[in-house]
Amino acid sequence: MSLKMKGKKYTDLDFVPTISDSEEDVPDLDSDEEKPKPETKGKKKNKSVDEESADMNSGFRFNTDDGEINTNFDGWEFLGDEKDEEKKDVDLDKIIRKKGGLIGMAHVDEAEKSESEESESDDEDLAMDGFGMGAQEQPEGEEEDEDASNSEQESNDEEEDDDEETYDVGDAGDAEEKVEEDTAEEMQAFYAPESESENAKKEVHKTFNDLALSRPVMKGLSNLGYVKPSPIQSATIPIALLGKDIIAGAVTGSGKTAAFMIPIIERLLYKPAKVASTRVIVLTPTRELAIQVADVGKKIGQFVSNLTFGLAVGGLNLRQQEQMLKTRPDIVIATPGRFIDHIRNSASFNVDSVEVLVIDEADRMLEDGFQDELNEIMSLLPSKRQTLLFSATMNSRIKQLISLSLKRPVRIMIDPPKQAATKLTQEFVRIRKRDHLKPSLLFNLIRKLDPNGQKRIVVFVARKDMAHKLRIILGLLGMAVAELHGSLTQEQRLDSVNKFKSLQVPVLICTDLASRGLDIPKIEVVINYDMPKSYEIYLHRVGRTARAGREGRSITFVGEASAERSIVKDAIRGVNDSEIPGSKAVGRNVDWNQVEETNKIVENMDQTVQDILVEEKEEKEILRAEMELKKGENLLKHKDEIQSRPKRTWFQSEKEKKNSKIMGALSKTKKEVNSKKRKRNEAMEDGHKRSYKKTQSDRTADQERTMKKQAKANGKKKGKSKGKR
């Protein structure tokens, strides 16, 4: 049979055919390249040699060591819409430059630079609760000598610092809330037999070849430099390929995204070739994480023919997404709100043929903020589907998981719960009553850690306005900084991430928006400027560094609140409980005199900071006015077309949204609703109007009316008694 006839035979099949022992005549069905034109007989031999050299690099070799990711891999792409013209925005750096900032690292002379490089080991961490000091590569003898020399040089002043760095966290556990755990009977009834998860974790796959994956998927993994599956990938991929539901947890940076993308792409190799439909939905809590997951999938499946991806996230062009979803891509990565919007308002998009649902960062998605959206999505998706849940802190209770309609899921927890990554050094700086010095302390730390701007440093803050203010302060001090939070447009957010990734700006100040899932390679340091609300959020924050076996460092500013000390206690306990060496929890010395000197400069900048904020606000108002003017022109110009569009709908009314937020806030504070309020809420739900509540003036008027009635009654009684006499 000729090669042409064999190719025709395979195209009629709806699945990938098995390759026989003789592979010479099998066409490359997965290649996206065009077929070369036929050549003369004389060139046939040269042609085969050229094709062979093109398919296989002569210098290629299989890497069988323990490395998982190629060091040449530059990370995932964060690309948004492709627009013809860029949207106008306020250039904050230009305003800061006008005020004298962003010229260079301010107030740093050569002597200080050389001193910071030479004495970095002298300002190393104080041992805390039995943890060693110094870098991991130093021999033990050198550590002891360095410790001795440091203790001789740092006399009375350092004794005070020693007291500061000794954390008294003995009473911090009192503030911890008691969390109800699932009973053994509940777990046995809900989850698959424990033997399945234990067998999955015990089975070790040294390479991806042991997982019996198809050649297009293997080619994509090889192109990314993936050789050895991580423990979470080794355990979950075989179970996912069997079509079973999974609840999986592993430390940050362990390859969870690839753990669900690889089996999904492998399954889609066997999809019907002639029927276009959306078969996989991946839900993420943030837009940046969705864009990253889409890029992971595209790069793993780049050699799989006819595999399509769609992105449905907020902040990007709605019409472009609608046009893309019309093609019914195989895999749609979405955020919950925009996903529901497209299901309800995009006529050509439906989810009737969805076979796999993935919820990334599942514990965050199960919180109150996403609960209503998640319930709506579950009601729209087919009940017969495979559901995969992944998170670094997967501690959700069965009561929360019931709403996801899981069918005896296999529970795979690779690492102990609530544990940071290995090779992470966790440092703590006790602030005491010096909160006003935190901006100056942050500047001094960054200057000491990275005087030349060649390291990637992420700074986490609690509030958006603080992130913006810190960007201005550090910019005035000559430091290039980007910010990432919810007040920025999606284009600004992606621009900040890309500039940080390419080291155009070495410092990224962000809220917890960036604490989950984002995998930017070679983040050396994470600084917690504000303490997170919980230890779980802390783990996600520090998980931005020390990823995939690399070393990393986190520095946390700790106040006097019991909740903050409790997080420090949990971090120390996590390191103590860790059986793998490499992670440390230590205190860090700070030269507070130098911080005070920097703070004098920062205080003198207060008026300049306010002037910059005012100028930025004015420019934003001008741009907003221009945008409104352009919007009005478009409404007049395209009036008929705009009015003919159907009105977009949502599954909740404004009143229902408000009630949902109130109930969510009550559940967070754990306040029980008393019987009076409960009856009133029930009456409102039944459609009855709220009864009128008397005011103080109403009660006073009632009292006066009652007194008049009593006076009249008393007068009548007296008149009757006189008549009888």
Curated annotation (Swiss-Prot):
Gene3D superfamilies hit by this protein: P-loop containing nucleotide triphosphate hydrolases (3.40.50.300)
Region Disordered, annotated ranges: 14-184, 646-725
Location of the Helicase C-terminal domain: 423-613
Residues in coiled coil: 607-686
ATP-binding found in the keyword field: yes
Keywords assigned: ATP-binding, Coiled coil, Helicase, Hydrolase, Nucleotide-binding, Nucleus, Ribosome biogenesis, RNA-binding
Localization terms from the record: Nucleus, Nucleolus
Cross-referenced CDD domains: DEADc_DDX27, SF2_C_DEAD
GO molecular function terms noted in the UniProt entry: ATP binding; ATP hydrolysis activity; RNA binding; RNA helicase activity
Assembly, per entry: Associates with pre-ribosomal particles.
Protein name as catalogued: ATP-dependent RNA helicase DRS1
Gene: DRS1
